[in-house]
Amino acid sequence: MRLFKDHVEKLLGQPMVMIYKPGAAGVIAGAYVKESKPDGYTFFVISNTSLVSSMVTRKADFTLDDFTPICTLTLSPIIFAVKKDSPYKTFKDFTEAATTKKLKYGTTAALSATQLIVEAIGRQEGFQAIHVPIAGGAKAMATVLGGHVDMAGVSPTGIESQLRILAVVLQNRWEAYPDVPTLKELGYPIGPEVYFSLYAPKGTPKEIVDRIHGAYTRVLAEHREEITKRAKGINQIARVLGPEELGKMSRDSYDFVKTMVSKIQAPVN
């Protein structure tokens, strides 16, 4: 949201105050927004995957129906990476090895969408790797470098030059790593892309939704070079998609997470 903030404030003639409600993977912030008036003054910035994961795995006191989707802001690629001297040169090398030995992989949280993607691939390919939850992307990468896990699936953190990236979770190849295939290319059209997005309380009028969505669309169009460069600096891709697309993406993400959690019969915290 910071990428757009100054320009959106000028366009709307309204200051934007960012209130942090940390804790419980978005549950506290989500509850706050759910109880807010649908007057166009309170919004919820969270990734689609974190939002639905909090509903499925953390007993959140809200559902998708409690929010009005506004638009996406940035796409956050997920990469699967190994040590540069790893025997696994490709993602297929990893999946094939995982069918004959117990390999370990790390993600930033138990029951994260990234873990569920690997679980889904394991069911497709006939393996069950050992999941290691690690607090934070940088620590996960360091855990790979230290040889404590065989692979990590995380958002880029800036130390990718020390690793070998095997695959990326995107619909199309990432400009930052054009030689790295997507999971979709490799035959795994599995799991949601991760978008940091803007949601409003349920009942927010359409004219407000359209105005806010329009403001972000216009700001990206008029300041594309600046915002794209800043997004690249934090390993994200600036992309504004509208309420219909965000709504469908959120529902699809929810269905994927709920289905996979049910399949692995994971305990709900």
Question: What does each model-found stretch correspond to?
Answer:
Residues 1-4, 22-24, 106-112:
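Extracytoplasmic "Venus flytrap"
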Residues 218, 224-247:
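Mature extracytoplasmic/periplasmic domains
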Residues 104-180:
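Ligand-binding pocket segment of bilobal, Venus flytrap-like solute-binding proteins
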Residues 18:
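Short conserved active-site loop signatures built around small residues
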Residues 8-10, 35-41, 55-135, 193-230:
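Hinge/capping helix and adjacent helix->loop/strand transition within the periplasmic-binding protein
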Residues 40-44, 79, 150-151, 165:
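Short, Asp-centered acidic motifs that coordinate Mg2+ and/or phosphate
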Residues 21-29, 75, 131-146, 244:
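Short helix-initiation/N-cap motifs at beta->coil->alpha
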Residues 75, 155-227, 252-255, 260, ...:
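C-terminal lobe and pocket-closing loops
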